[in-house]
Amino acid sequence: MFSNAFTDKAVMAELVAKMLWEIKAVHFRADEPYRLASGMASPVYIDCRKLVSYPRIRSAVMDFAAATILREAGFEQFDVVAGGETAGIPFAAMLAERLGLPMIYVRKAPKGHGRNAQIEGYMPEGARVLVIEDLTTAGGSMFKFIDAIRAAGGVVEHGIALFYYDIFPEARGNMKSKGVDLHYIATWRNVLAVARELALFDEKTLNEVEAFLNAPLDWSGRNGGVRALAVQ
């Protein structure tokens, strides 16, 4: 169970950023940009799935996730924790254990045989469900799972991402307009701040990353990626 130690939010963000650098989950590559699934060109890439392979780090991150939810959403607001296929599943299991709640997971699509289920596990009608993902850019992938839960009779008013890109100012407002408050621990700003503090890259690379964070679609367009993107 969660220890109820409520670390300061800024401290949690900085520590998670440092942990992500420590396990080499973060990559900066301004001279040869990554191409994201959205079509955007990006000088940054993160693999939060690596967290599951580092027990001490994953334990700390999940403690921070529990603290974030209890502080920002409340102690008795949820009946079930849900993770999306596949990256969200292990984090849902760990967060559910800390919060003392049941867990379900949501497939990207019904499995197509047997019960043709999209939701695995037991979710009572009207259950208040907390959805967790390892990371989110604008909430689009999270809403695929939220829509499935709502269609099955669950109530979703909160989602949490361990890492939030925080590059589109309208993203959280869009989620709020659909009835969901987004919570998160760390962002690219935290990761960049640690990179500067520890001098992990040359100044040119750091400045390019900051330029991307300030105007991601402009940066993408200048570097061969899409110049427009519907933030849903």
UniProtKB/Swiss-Prot annotation:
Domain of life: Bacteria
Enzyme Commission identifier(s): 2.4.2.10
Any one GO molecular-function label of the UniProt entry: magnesium ion binding
CDD domains noted in UniProt: PRTases_typeI
SUPFAM superfamilies per UniProt: PRTase-like
InterPro entries found in the cross-reference section: OPRT, Or_phspho_trans_dom, PRibTrfase_dom, PRTase-like
Residues annotated as binding 5-phospho-alpha-D-ribose 1-diphosphate: 107-108, 111, 113, 133-141
Catalytic activity entry: orotidine 5'-phosphate + diphosphate = orotate + 5-phospho-alpha-D-ribose 1-diphosphate
Pathway recorded for this protein: Pyrimidine metabolism; UMP biosynthesis via de novo pathway; UMP from orotate: step 1/2
Cofactor(s) required, per the database record: Mg(2+)
Gene3D superfamilies reported for this sequence: 3.40.50.2020
Keywords: Glycosyltransferase, Magnesium, Pyrimidine biosynthesis, Transferase
GO biological process, one term: pyrimidine nucleobase biosynthetic process
Residues that hold orotate according to the record: 137
Membership in a protein family: Belongs to the purine/pyrimidine phosphoribosyltransferase family. PyrE subfamily.
Record's function text: Catalyzes the transfer of a ribosyl phosphate group from 5-phosphoribose 1-diphosphate to orotate, leading to the formation of orotidine monophosphate (OMP).
Assembly with partners or alone: Homodimer.
Full protein name: Orotate phosphoribosyltransferase
Source lineage: Bacteria, Pseudomonadati, Pseudomonadota, Alphaproteobacteria, Hyphomicrobiales
